[in-house]
């Protein structure tokens, strides 16, 4: 009987690896270990945000599925508004959404005006943090929910703190709660393709002066570490008609992105009671891309005069859907090649990096 030719070191390594992979696959199922090229996320499944500029800034067209995302910012900056738009977009695509309202503050009528089908929206108003995160975990494990929103991390009070005496401190309890929840949720979320969004608030660090940002988010470092996308949303201007304010100009910075390049931004208007102004955003992006010409207070799209005054043109685009779609197609084509980026500060770079987790 002829002897098998001796294998070269490279062939022996390849055979050993193949045997190990086959054993792992038999024991833990197909896909337990694979080469990155076997499952390359060229087209990452996403949920649109309701903002054209933000979808483009995220690099993949929206919030990635099967990942954890964090939306944080100061009070009244538009965090919940943006999240409700994401819910509306998910429902429009036929998805099932759940809203874990730890703050007990969801405005149902406002959600309807933003396009959310509240009759189909699953809502939970938990009593304490562990209950909220357990409900979120069970919804994800069901595999039947496309989007779970937790509003907000700051309201996820540990049960021990809730049942303790007023003034009694539970040092690190909130951070431990979030760390434990993230470890449980991450693997389940990836397998289920559910997108989980945590809304978070900003707090001021105690005793920080000089170098470094005095701001931080609540809940410790675990959420920063496990989030694939982190969005910093800020109100940068109040929109006024004479003396009466009717909305706010808002900037969203992508300070962390594991699915596309970070440090991109989007600017849009949030109109009180109406949410993100898609027509207003298209007008701004069209001017930036030189698709819409502005001469003084007059606006034109090619040879077509759109009108005089920004608000009148915005109203026109709200009514004329065909015209809006034409402008949108050109804007998306331009910004897909020329994304709006910002120069990151030291704080932005720190936010984009995974923090060191402590047990």
Swiss-Prot record:
HAMAP family: RecA
KW Cell division (keyword) present: no
Encoding gene (name): recA
Keyword terms of this UniProt record: ATP-binding, Cytoplasm, DNA damage, DNA recombination, DNA repair, DNA-binding, Nucleotide-binding, SOS response
GO biological process, one term: DNA recombination
NCBIfam families with a match to the protein in the record: tigrfam_recA
Gene3D superfamilies: P-loop containing nucleotide triphosphate hydrolases
Subcellular location field: Cytoplasm
Family note: Belongs to the RecA family.
A Pfam family that the UniProt record links to this protein: RecA
InterPro entries linked to this entry: AAA+_ATPase, DNA_recomb/repair_RecA, DNA_recomb/repair_RecA_CS, P-loop_NTPase, RecA-like_C, RecA-like_N, RecA_ATP-bd, RecA_C_sf
Keyword Membrane: no
Main localization category: cytoplasm
Name by which UniProt lists this protein: Protein RecA
GO cellular component: cytosol
Primary role: Can catalyze the hydrolysis of ATP in the presence of single-stranded DNA, the ATP-dependent uptake of single-stranded DNA by duplex DNA, and the ATP-dependent hybridization of homologous single-stranded DNAs. It interacts with LexA causing its activation and leading to its autocatalytic cleavage.
GO molecular function: ATP binding; ATP hydrolysis activity; ATP-dependent DNA damage sensor activity; damaged DNA binding; single-stranded DNA binding
Entry-linked SUPFAM superfamilies: P-loop containing nucleoside triphosphate hydrolases (SSF52540), RecA protein, C-terminal domain (SSF54752)
Residues involved in ATP binding: 73-80
């Amino acid at each position: 009987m002829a002897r098998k030719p001796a294998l070269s070191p490279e062939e022996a390594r390849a055979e050993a690896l193949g045997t190990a992979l086959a054993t792992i696959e038999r024991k833990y199922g197909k896909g337990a270990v694979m080469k990155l090229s076997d499952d390359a996320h060229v087209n990452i499944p996403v949920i649109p945000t309701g903002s054209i500029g933000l979808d483009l800034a995220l690099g993949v067209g929206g919030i990635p599925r099967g990942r954890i995302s964090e939306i944080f910012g100061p009070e009244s900056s538009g965090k919940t508004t943006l999240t409700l738009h994401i819910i509306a977009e998910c429902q429009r695509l036929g998805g099932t959404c759940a809203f874990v309202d730890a703050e007990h503050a969801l405005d149902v009528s406002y959600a309807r005006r933003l396009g959310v089908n509240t009759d189909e929206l699953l809502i939970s108003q938990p009593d304490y943090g562990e209950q909220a995160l357990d409900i979120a975990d069970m919804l994800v494990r069901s595999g039947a929910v496309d989007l779970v929103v937790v509003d907000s991390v700051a309201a996820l009070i540990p049960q021990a703190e809730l049942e303790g005496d007023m003034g009694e401190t539970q040092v690190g309890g909130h951070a431990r709660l979030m760390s434990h929840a993230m470890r449980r949720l991450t693997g389940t979320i990836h397998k289920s393709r559910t997108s989980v969004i945590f809304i978070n608030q900003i707090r001021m660090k105690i005793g920080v002066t000089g170098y470094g940002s005095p701001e931080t988010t609540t809940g410790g470092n675990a959420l920063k570490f496990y989030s694939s996308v982190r969005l910093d949303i800020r109100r940068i201007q109040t929109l006024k008609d004479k003396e009466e304010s009717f909305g706010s100009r808002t900037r969203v910075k992508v300070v962390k992105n594991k699915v596309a390049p970070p440090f991109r931004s989007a600017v849009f208007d949030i109109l009180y009671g109406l949410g993100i102004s898609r027509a207003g955003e298209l007008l701004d992006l069209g001017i930036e891309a030189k698709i819409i010409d502005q001469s003084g207070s007059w606006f034109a799209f090619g040879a077509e005069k759109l009108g005089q005054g920004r608000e009148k043109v915005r109203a026109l685009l709200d009514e004329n859907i065909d015209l809006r779609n034409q402008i949108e197609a050109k804007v998306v084509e331009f910004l897909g090649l020329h994304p709006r980026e910002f120069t990151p500060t030291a704080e932005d770079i720190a936010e984009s990096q995974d923090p060191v987790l402590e047990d």
